[in-house]
Every structure is written in C-alpha cells, then in structure tokens.
Amino acid sequence: MSEHGMISRELCKPDSAFAELEKAKSAWRKEVLKLGFGGNVPFAHYVNGWAVYQTLACRLMGRCSVYQSGGAIGFRDQLQDAVNLLLISPTPARRQILDCCAHQYLEGDVMHWWHAMPDGDRGVRTRCSDDMLWLVWALCEYVEKTGDTDICSEAVYYVNSSPLEGSETDRYEMPQRSSVSTSVLDHAKAAVDCCANRGVGMHGLLLFGSGDWNDGMNNIDGEGVWLSWFFAHTVRRFADLLVMLCKQGSDHYRALAASCGTAADRAWDGSWYLRGYWSDGEPIGSKNDG
C-alpha cells in the first residue's frame, strides 16, 4: 500500500481523524491569533482570528471568494491581501511584491492575473489602468510598516510580449521572461511612468482604460476620478520614498501627484464627487443623473 493509502486508512479511524483535526486547529490558532485586539466582543473575535484566517486560507492560499473561484493570482488582489497581513507577518507582502515585479512587462504595465503552470505562467495582459499602481502602493506600505528598505534594491526580471495593438483590449498569453532585470524601486518607477504616460482627458484626470479598479467599468473610455485620487495618493508616497532613499526624481513625481489631485478635487459635484467622465465629457455619477 502506498504512503498516501496508509495515511487515508489511518484517518478513517475516528480517533485519528479527531486528533489530526485538533492539530490543524492548534496550528491555525498559532498563525492567526497574533493581534490581541482587546475585548470579548464579536468584532474582536473577527479581527483577531477570522479576518486573518480568511485572508490567508481563502485569499492567498485558495485564491477564491464566493463569486470568483478561478484560482488565479490577481495582481492587485493578492497585493492588497498580503499588505493587510503586515501586522501579522511581513513575509507574504514581501513575497507578493517580488512576484508581482516578475509579472510586469518591460513597458511598465502588468499581467492582470495569471495561473502558475509548470511550463510557464499563463494570464492576461490588459489595459486596466490601476493594476500597476498597486505595486507602488504595496511597496510604500511595506517599507513604511517594516523599515525594510533592502527590498527596494532587489533585482527582478520583467516579462516580455508584444504590446497590445490598437484594437486589443486584452490578450490571454504566456509571456516569456525578458533578459532585463532592474531593482524593485525601478519596477515601481516603471509602473508610475506607464500610468502617467497614458495621459489625461479634457478634465486633467487619468484615463479609465479597460477599468480603474472597478473592472465592470471597462467600456467607459473616459476619465476616472477614483484613479486620479489613487494615483495622487500613491505617487506622493512614492516621492517620499525616493527622498528617504536619497534617490533623484521626487520633485517630478510630486508634481505629477499634485496635478492629478487638483484635477480630482475639481470633480466635486456639490453633494459628492463624480465617479468620472465619459469620453464626450458627460459626467458619471452626478447628483443630476436620473
């Protein structure tokens, strides 16, 4: 009988099964009960255990949710999940930042999601406008929370494929690893530059592309307020990181951030901020919409 068969037979015995279950519970308790948020209230139980368990088991390990069970590694998704665990352990965030750098194209855009396959990773190249910025955000969060600046100098290869053509909104592919590697900091610069170089619309806001965090807004073809906010917030922090590392370029990036932030502030509609603008200049999410 194979080793797996012997293990299966042993676990069919109730005593053995219950003993292994308790071992698994004990291991998970050690992993997730690290915050020590005070109080015997439901919120404390959620934060101290279940939120961490869900992030680790469901999001990072299982890569699934109640509405999405494809098992792919999402560029923005797993960066957000891993950064949320920084108070528990910095390891997932560090690992995810490096992995996402390895799924960035030479042009600065990134794979929206991918499946890790034995013969090479397969995924989609898109025109989503926010994906690459999450790498910059995650790097700033990681360095700020851990003080580990060494990650900024780690060298990581890019991936390479033909850029999307004019009529292509996305492409499923297996890109090749390029011969070019740069520091994580330069990967972050490439991400900011890629987003900025796509330009702004008539209101000075960054362009939606094929979705700016809200993937359902893939046919707007206009300008995004949220995206411009996120760019301003993230790039301002990136400029601060450059100063901390004694690197050049902080003034340039601070000016880019200020320009986007100012344009986004002008999107105030009297009661709330607009969501964006269609390509013809019509507002999205106005208080005057029916």
Residue locations for each model-derived region?
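Residue-level signal for short amphipathic helical patches enriched in basic/charged
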Residues: R76, I88, T146, L245-Q248
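Catalytic cores of carbohydrate-active enzymes
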Residues: M111-H112, F230-G290
